[in-house]
């Protein structure tokens, strides 16, 4: 169609990777132990020459599917972000319904369960990272919220066209990972080349953009995923 990006966009380099939505087909799905009626696409995972610090998956959970033992690594913390359907998250003896935009932070060692108790497909992102403990700092608390309940922070020198929805206070050093929603209005430009210590995974929720990654310009659209090595401009 006239709206389809036509360039051959899948690329894997030492500094970044672009995984277009068109590569996420039925034949490349994976499965996890203790998850019923669930399949996933592994967008990144710790691997030499690739993501070093985190894993990111897109999971599809069919009606009545889910897991009562989702996390098998007691050192792993996790973030859930729902993009379609509704998830029932059980944690600390309470049930929470996560709808699109729903966010949950789950500290390491926390027992939780997730089910799709609806008759519709559930799709969500699961980001996992081994927690780096620091003596004198407690584990972070569970956070359950929705992006609609958070006021985005407008970034400086962008005429209000670039904003970031932060689920965690950047000054809370109990957290060693952050998942945010970044919004660009039409015509918005990042006014400098970002170069910093944070390794990135970026999933395009909606819209289209042109990104400068290292020395290359790449086109991305809704459903595409990018991984950026630490310090990659």
Model-derived features: where do they sit?
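Glycine- and acidic-residue-biased ligand/ion/polar-headgroup-sensing regions
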Residues: 75-88, 92, 197-214
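Conserved short histidine dyad/triad with adjacent acidic residue
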Residues: 37-46, 55-74, 165-168, 180-196, ...
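N-terminal regulatory/effector-sensing and dimerization cores
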Residues: 65, 69, 76-78, 86-90, ...
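Surface-exposed interaction/gating patches
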Residues: 144-200, 205-211, 218
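A short, N-terminal "cap"/entry segment at the start of jelly-roll beta-barrel domains
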Residues: 1-53, 119-176
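Asparagine-centered strand-capping/turn motif at beta-strand->loop junctions
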Residues: 114-118
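Short acidic-glycine-tyrosine-enriched beta hairpin
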Residues: 93-108, 214-232
